[in-house]
């Protein structure tokens, strides 16, 4: 993870993720999203820290056991960019993108493609996700 490389030590909990996000903002980016899928336990927590905001946005969810998680980071970043292009603000874009990725992992958890880590199911049900709610 970028946070691990920057600090040269593993990030082990949400408080360390919050601190790392604040440190990474010092490089001049407008927002930092640290994924917490590597944390121990059955809950995951992602941390979104936006420049100029004192409190981070936390996105928690239950961890889904699946061998098919290859590409989740790329899918998440692409989905965030898509929702930003649709006019959502960053926290909303991240929330919707995480929902899309979570559903893709859930829908693909029992599918076996070759050996090793397979991809999430990107095509689980795309139509409802492309409708912008007013």
Residue spans of the language-model regions?
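Phosphate-handling active-site elements
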Residues: 55-57, 83-97
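Conserved phosphate-donor
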Residues: 19-61
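Short, small-residue-biased leader/transition segments that mark boundaries at the very start
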Residues: 1-6
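Short glycine/threonine-rich catalytic loop with a Thr-x-Gly-x-Asp
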Residues: 63-80
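Charged C-terminal helix
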Residues: 92-134
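Solvent-exposed, amphipathic alpha-helical segments
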Residues: 75, 79, 83-87, 103, ...
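Charged helix-capping and loop-helix junction motifs
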Residues: 13-18
